[in-house]
Structure formats: structure tokens, C-alpha cells
Amino acid sequence: MIMSDRLTAFKELIQAGGAKRPADLIIKNGQLVNVMTAEIYPAEVAIYQGKIVAVDPDVSAYQGTETRVIDAKQQYIVPGLIDGHIHVECSKLSMTSFAEAVVPHGTTSIISGLDEYISVIGVDGLSEIFKEVDQLPMRVFWGAPFKTPYTIPASTIADNIDSTVQAQLQKRSDVYGVWETVREAVETLDEDTLKTLLNAQDNHVPVWGCAPMATGTKLNEYLMSGVRVDHESYDHQELLEKVRKGINVVIRESSVTHFLAENIRAITETNGQIARHVSFCTDDVNAMDIVNKGHLDHLVRLAIAAGVAPMTAIQMATINSAEAYRIDDQVGLIAPGRNADILLVSDLEAFEIKRVLAKGQPVATDGHINQSIERPVRPASLANTIIREAVQASDFEYHVAADASQVTVQTIASEGPFVRHAKTKTLTVEDGIVQIDPAKDVALISVLERFGKNGNQSLGFTSGWTLKKGAMASTAAPDDNNIIVMGVNPDDMALAVNTLIERDGGQVVVADGQILSFLPLPIAGIVSDVTPAELAVQEEGILKASQAIGSEVVDPMFYMTFLPITAIPDLAITDLGNVDCNELRLFDPILTIQ
């Protein structure tokens, strides 16, 4: 919008605030939940051009002949909810489908780095995503990733962000912070990262962090970087220490990590005064959970059930995030000048959302979007992103000396999505090929570069999955989104990977040469335009298929896709090879050969 148009619109908003222009919409007969003052009292709200222009006992002066009036029927008027940290692409829903999923549950704003998109289509490709977001009843506050790739050592993605690119991004008006600054990059004094952080200081751009299990001197060292927000506390003592040391902490309750019950103890058992410095996020959430449980509204209910007062829980889902991310001039509270993202809630204890207004318009009622949102026409840049030749079964054979009879291997033992330890296993060797043994709970794991850069492929061993047969694979695997495949049969592993290459992305489970379940991800190989309900059914199909090949993990496919993240201790695997996340180096999974 050019300056003259902005000035005209700005003048109109000011006039509307002075009741010199009639409101577009008025909410009457409601109880305002004032998250700034922790009060609840009768109030009316006037809205003009998507902005709140008045919050008073009586806004009759703002009503014109064409003003729409909503009777709140004594329901509670609550600010729209804010997800304080989310890799929205991990839902496998496009931005449009994701908005359809979460807006009826009261989520009207999200904080995201859109880093999964960047790994595939680059920063320039985000222009298409921002166009899509502009048409949605949901706001995205974008934090530009501190660098890409995040992995140490650096793995392969389609497009890299370094400090030079970051310096340019920090000048953009749509960049609200530096996203996901991992502690290891600070600890190792990575100069490119440090340049970005110094630029952020100069440009007054807030830095958002990622520091799991950082306490004591590790935390002190990390905080010298200028980080102000962190979403990685594994227990309530860690959360408390971080708040005491000046961090705004975001409690994560995702589809794969459930930290709310433990983290909330810092408020309910230790010090309730810290609550205003704590907020919520879902980080990585799938469609099944959104459809079956809700989104931020679910977290509010969990907090209330854990003993948090409803007002406090609502603050954690609204104003706390807004203040932590310095966007409280736009969202997080119901006050003049703020965006008109508003919920009508019938019961604060049950936190039952009856109506959602976003950008000043009623968009959802009783948990359902008022009308389906049209999907944009997708450009060619978002399709055909799997640039990889077909593979063979022999690509999934781990070769050692031809005269070897057995090997001792170090497996990446999964004890949950964000807990991975080393476990030693002994495997037999036949004709120089290590034999994968399901009876010993060992599977082969491989990551294949899929951007046409170098053709990298890694091989390693993993345990804890109880696979009995077959394989499963995905082109959506944060934060690099290369192809990851796990299996106990080379032929099935090759079939799984080739299926993803041929079908331009998705997730697949195979066994005995047959495809048991396939979930298509045609947009950048990471997301889909189907409805949330449709994707939830597809996810359930993948889950049942992975259970059919023996896995007893809660969500095997989702858990597997996190194996390339090197910020999660202790071990990972990328297209470069097996990674010791503590030493930040590659390691050979073969320990001994006999």
C-alpha cells in the first residue's frame, strides 16, 4: 500500500476511534476478559476495518445505520489465541488447510519461521506463502531463521540463509524476530551466527531461541547472545531457572512431546508469580490431534485442569505471547488500536469457544469454519521438488569387509521423539553385508538428499521401533526435509523411497513389496491442500500401517521424521551421516568388526 493510501486509512481509523465514523461491527451484552488487568467486567466492543476502535460500557455512539450488531448473550469476550512457536508445515497442512483447522479452535495468530518451506523453496519462494496467508483469517508473525540449515555439521537443503541474507531480512517490515537460534551455534562461537545476532542488536530485532536442557553455565553462556524467548524446557526446574534469568518461556505441548503437565508445576507448585512470563506453543502438531483435541484451546483446558486459574491460562495463550514477541501493539488483548481477533466463550473453566472473529469478521461458530476457504492456484515452484534418481535395494545394504562374520554397531536408540541415546547391538555379517535383525529391534535408517544438489545418502542403525518387517519413508522431515527411510528389508526400503520420488512427495509404509498406506504431500513435498479431516484420516492410515509392520511407538512416522534434527540430544542422522549431537561431529556407527 502506498503512503497516500495508508494515510487515508490511518485517518479513518483515528476518526472511527473518536466515533466520527460508524463502526462496521459491534459486540454487545458480553463480559470482557481483560488480560492486561486480569479483570472481567461488562463491556461492548466496536470494530472498524478490522481494528478495535472502542471498548467501553456503552458503544452506542459508534453504531450507524449499517453497523452489524452481535449479541454476546453474556458470553465472555476473549482475545484470539496465539501459538507462540510452531513449525506449521509439520502439520502437513497447507497454510489454508491449517487455518481451517485451528481458527475454529480460537487460534488467530501464530509465530513461525516457515523454515520447513525455506529448506525446500528458499526465502524467495515464501512470497507465494505470504500471498496465501494474506487471504486467511489467521495472522503469521514471521521470524527469519537465524541460519539454514540448522544442523551441525551443516547438511544439505535447497537454499541456505547466512548472515548476509539475514542482514537483508532484518530490514523487512514483515520480519518480527530471529527464529530458532539454537544453543549449539552460540556455544561453538559460530561466527556467521554471531554476525546475525550482532545485526539483530543493531536493528533492535528480538532473538528467539532453542535451548533444550540448558541450565547453569550453559544457560548463562547462551543468554549472552541476547536471546529473549525459549520454547525448550524439559522440566519445571529448567523453566523456572530460565524465567529467573530473564527469558520468556514458551511451554510446548505438541503431538509428540507433552511437556505442559510437567512444566506447569513451576506455576502451580513453585511460584505463581512467574505465570505472566510463560506462554504456550504446539511446535509440531498433526491434523489428527487438532481434529480430535483442538489446538491452543486444548492447552488452555489442560492448564486449567492442572490447577491454573482460567484468567492466568488465557493470559498465557494471549497477552503473554504477544508481549514476549513484542507484538502486543497488534494482538493479544482487546483494546483500541489492536486487531479485531476475538473469541466468544461460554464457559471459562471449560473454555468452550462458541464464536471466532478474525480480522474483524465472524469466521467460525461452534468449532466449525463458517465457510470453506478457497485454495490458491499453486505455482510450479511448489511442485516437482523431489529431484532424485530412483534407488535400488542395494543402496540400503551396509557393507563391511567381505570376510567379516559379525559387527558391533552403535544404534540411534529412540526413547521418545526428543530423547535419543546410543545403544550397542551385535549383528551378523553375510558376504560383507550387515544383516538387519528385527529380533534384536534393529532397523536400518537412511537419509537421501532430494534437492538435486549432491546425491548424498547416509546409512545408520536405529533401535526402539520394534519393526518386524517392511519400511516407512517421508519427504517431510524437519528441518532439512530430505527423504528419510527406515526399514528392515532393503527391497521394501527401495520401494518406499521410489514411491515418494515417483509421486512427488509424501509419506509411505510398505511391506512384502506392497504399499500399505500412502499420504500424498504434493506441495513442496511437505504439505497438502486437503481438508484437516481428510488429512487426519490419511494420518490414521499411516499410523495403522506402521503398527501393522510391528512398531509399538506412539506415532512412528512422526517420531522418525525428527531423527535428522541435530539440536535434539544425543544422536541424529542427516544426509551427511550419523551425528553425535553432543560433540557436534559425524561418527561411524560400526564400532567393531570380527
Swiss-Prot record:
The keyword Cell cycle does not apply. Keywords: Hydrolase, Manganese. GO terms for molecular function: adenine deaminase activity. Its cofactor is Mn(2+). One of its GO terms (biological process) is adenine catabolic process. It catalyses: adenine + H2O + H(+) = hypoxanthine + NH4(+). It comes from the Bacteria. Its EC number is 3.5.4.2. The keyword DNA damage does not apply. Belongs to the metallo-dependent hydrolases superfamily. Adenine deaminase family. This is Adenine deaminase 1. The gene is ade1.
